[in-house]
UniProtKB/Swiss-Prot annotation:
It is found in: Cytoplasm, Cell cortex; Cytoplasm, Cytoskeleton. Residues 168-186 have a biased composition (Low complexity). The modification N6-methyllysine is found at residue 75. PROSITE patterns: LIM_DOMAIN_1, LIM_DOMAIN_2, NEBULIN, SH3. GO terms for cellular component: cell cortex; cytoskeleton; focal adhesion. The keyword Electron transport does not apply. The modification Phosphothreonine is found at residues 68, 104. Plays an important role in the regulation of dynamic actin-based, cytoskeletal activities. Agonist-dependent changes in LASP1 phosphorylation may also serve to regulate actin-associated ion transport activities, not only in the parietal cell but also in certain other F-actin-rich secretory epithelial cell types. The gene is LASP1. This is LIM and SH3 domain protein 1. It comes from Oryctolagus cuniculus (Rabbit). Nebulin repeats lie at residues 61-95, 97-131.
Amino acid sequence: MNPNCARCGKIVYPTEKVNCLDKFWHKACFHCETCKMTLNMKNYKGYEKKPYCNAHYPKQSFTMVADTPENLRLKQQSELQSQVRYKEEFEKNKGRGFSVVADTPELQRIKKTQDQISNIKYHEEFEKSRMGPSGGEGAEPERRDSQDSSNYRRPPEQQQPPQPHHIPTSTPAYQQPQPQQVAQSYGYKEPAAPVSTQRGAPGGGGKRYRAVFDYSAADEDEVSFQDGDTIVNVQQIDDGWMYGTVERTGDTGMLPANYVEAI
């Protein structure tokens, strides 16, 4: 069925049909409501679903309103409502905005370093909680505990040097009286000599590790090293700490296990 023209009411055939403003028009009937100038789809302007030319398009006029106390109150109330809504939207969206950062190797290295620092801090807090409060001594028990743990591993390294001094300057037959002389001079420390001798043998050929990060000593019983340094005579203390010697500097002490890798 062919529709009727919105202006003349006659049937509009497809060859002369204009579909605009939700209505159907003849091309000749699609003109300005005021001056009757024929319009097309490029130069018409619609107002209340009626076509107008640019010159006769109805202009919107504004009425001046006096600033009465009631109008001022309504204006202030509208501004307050807008401000409340703005704050409400701000609080809802607070903390949600974030920017996507590319996962580069540098960021991965920084993230891994931060995780390792957090692991070290957790280890320190664990040592503090294990010792418990100690009155007015403050942080002294923590330092003493770290020194005790390092001194527990140090005797194999400290008692190892005296052994080579006796080996090249004496024959095996002459070396037999040495443990007896130590026993006579120290008495109760007699068992320490054979234990030290047994542990000193594998100490020189201990495990070797390579540093994968730079580390600065946070305590006097720790050692500092740089990325690529070789750590020798390494001994495992626990899951988080090791004891060894930095081959480049010759310093011996505790070091974090997650800063090195086995060679």
